[in-house]
């Protein structure tokens, strides 16, 4: 199965080649730090990117000896060849990130200026912010059938593909700058669902050529199930009195990654609350097309039930 991974990337190469013929396609500057380290071309110790990365793999002060030790680490020796077989260069990441940042600026989102680098490491985070640096761990995107992911549950492996990378980049950038910020009685499951719906709308707006199933992390079969059962899902949320529940655990059960959301429907895929939130936000935008992403990402927007009422969402 590992030999199939270059074929997965082949379609990405073709897509990038087509994009490269468009002179107006923005490209972000991305430092291929993992590649530099593997090749022994380590940036100067004053490098902001290198310092940020080494803080994620060691608590020791940065020294040439520490970098050399990391260069011979198992993570570098195991992941680097596999990453190189899927991502032959930084073009895919650079173009994806460039398009996202350009669209974010056009949409009026205030994202801080950062440096960007691709890395490999053994941490669980696929995207990590360290001070002003955004680290993208490419060893998290080697394909759902990658042998190194075999011990992970299926629902997690489905998001470990090159196609998922742009959506993760967009969500990380937006959610870090516009986090969910309600507390106490205002932090209802409904408000969290709407916020997650806005995040999904943001990904659809920022990622070039976005697909809803990919933005939500669902297979085609899961998307069909959700579309066919949306009404029963919504009625179950209402019937079980989950909508205005202020327990953080209830909201997490609805929107956090998981194999299923049995509290709603035994067959409901994980994060079903995010799907319903997106449907509510889409209904709202149908009647309020002038609403902007910065407005919708503010707590004043997703607080209370006004968005639900004004969306006239019915199922």
For the regions a language model picked out, list residue spans one by one:
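C-terminal motif of bacterial Sec signal peptides marking the signal peptidase cleavage site
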Residues: 12-15
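Structured segments of extracytoplasmic/periplasmic soluble domains
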Residues: 36-40, 103, 107-110, 205-209, ...
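C-terminal soluble interaction/assembly domains
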Residues: 247-315
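Acidic/His-rich structured neighborhood in mature extracellular/periplasmic domains
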Residues: 74-223, 293-294, 298
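N-terminal mature-domain "stem" immediately C-terminal to a signal peptide or N-terminal signal-anchor/transmembrane
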Residues: 17-78
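Acidic/His/Gly-enriched intrinsically disordered linker/tail segments
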Residues: 200-261
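Sec-dependent signal peptide recognition
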Residues: 2-7
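Residue-level recognition of alpha-helix termini/interfacial anchor residues
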Residues: 46-60, 224-233, 240, 288
């Amino acid at each position: 199965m590992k030999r199939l991974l270059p074929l997965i990337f082949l379609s990405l190469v073709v897509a990038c080649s087509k994009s490269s013929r468009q002179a107006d396609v923005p490209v972000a500057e991305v430092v291929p730090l993992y590649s530099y380290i593997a090749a022994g071309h380590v940036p100067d110790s004053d490098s902001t990117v290198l310092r940020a990365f080494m803080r994620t793999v060691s608590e020791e002060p940065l020294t040439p000896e520490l970098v050399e030790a990391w260069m011979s680490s198992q993570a570098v020796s195991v992941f680097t060849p596999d990453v190189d077989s899927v991502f032959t260069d930084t073009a895919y990441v650079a173009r994806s990130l460039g398009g996202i940042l350009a669209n974010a600026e056009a949409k009026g989102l205030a994202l801080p200026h950062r440096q960007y680098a691709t890395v490999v490491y053994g941490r669980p985070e696929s995207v990590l912010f360290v001070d002003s640096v955004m680290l993208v761990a490419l060893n998290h995107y080697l394909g759902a059938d990658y042998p190194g992911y075999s011990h992970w549950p299926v629902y997690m492996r489905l998001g470990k593909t090159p196609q998922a990378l742009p959506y993760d980049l967009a969500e990380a950038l937006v959610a870090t700058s516009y986090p969910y910020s309600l507390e106490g009685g205002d932090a209802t499951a409904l408000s969290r669902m709407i916020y997650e719906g806005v995040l999904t709308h943001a990904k659809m707006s920022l990622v070039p050529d976005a697909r809803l199933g990919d933005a939500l992390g669902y297979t085609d079969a899961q998307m069909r199930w959700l579309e066919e059962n949306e009404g029963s899902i919504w009625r179950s949320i209402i019937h079980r009195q989950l909508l205005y529940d202020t327990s953080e655990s209830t909201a997490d059960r609805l929107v956090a990654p998981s194999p299923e959301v049995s509290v709603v429907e035994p067959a409901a895929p994980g994060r079903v609350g995010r799907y319903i939130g997106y449907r509510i936000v889409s209904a709202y935008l149908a009647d309020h097309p002038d609403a902007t992403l910065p407005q919708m990402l503010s707590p004043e927007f997703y607080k209370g039930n006004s968005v639900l009422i004004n969306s006239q969402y019915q199922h």
